[in-house]
């Protein structure tokens, strides 16, 4: 590795898709959620469900990042909207408890996944070995991000975690 700028004390890294392979972990968690929640009741295949889920989830995150919706709305509707798209006669009130349960199941699976970006752990260990303070930044949900950091073993290597939830953005 190249020498670092003299006087640099902190290195800040994004968590998802820089250190942790969010996409791989999320897809595995969604596959497990599909099976655990028996979503084949509503969809003819996992492929149809995941396509609908990813479309709605992307739109909801865009709206959340613009502060147009709340975290609670995002977490429920990313599961509710794909199902209502395929089962239009189902009311929000009828499915809301199941959608909330699905979100909990998904986030629990997500927090347990261990797939990291190639070379990420080596980078963090290298920085730690050279006495750099390491901070992690993320826009993920506080409880899940802390669990993910612990699951992959980063919690013993970092000094500070800055989460958008914690600072109100």
Residue spans for each PLM region:
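Class I S-adenosyl-L-methionine
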Residues: 31-35, 80, 84, 125-128, ...
């Amino acid at each position: 590795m190249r020498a670092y700028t003299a006087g640099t004390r902190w290195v800040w890294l994004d968590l998802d898709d820089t250190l942790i392979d969010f996409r791989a972990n999320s897809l595995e968690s969604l596959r497990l959620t599909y099976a655990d929640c028996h979503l084949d009741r509503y969809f003819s295949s996992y492929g149809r469900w995941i396509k609908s889920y990813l479309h709605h989830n992307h739109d909801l995150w865009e709206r959340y990042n613009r502060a147009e919706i709340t975290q609670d709305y995002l977490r429920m509707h990313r599961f509710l909207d794909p199902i209502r798209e395929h089962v239009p006669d189902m009311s929000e009130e009828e499915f809301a408890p199941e959608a909330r349960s699905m979100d909990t199941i998904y986030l629990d699976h997500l927090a347990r996944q261990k797939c990291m970006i190639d070379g990420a752990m080596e980078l963090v260990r290298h920085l730690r070995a050279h006495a750099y303070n390491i901070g992690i930044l993320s826009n993920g949900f506080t409880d899940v991000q802390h669990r993910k950091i612990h699951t992959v073993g980063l919690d013993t290597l970092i000094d500070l975690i800055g989460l958008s939830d914690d600072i109100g953005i």
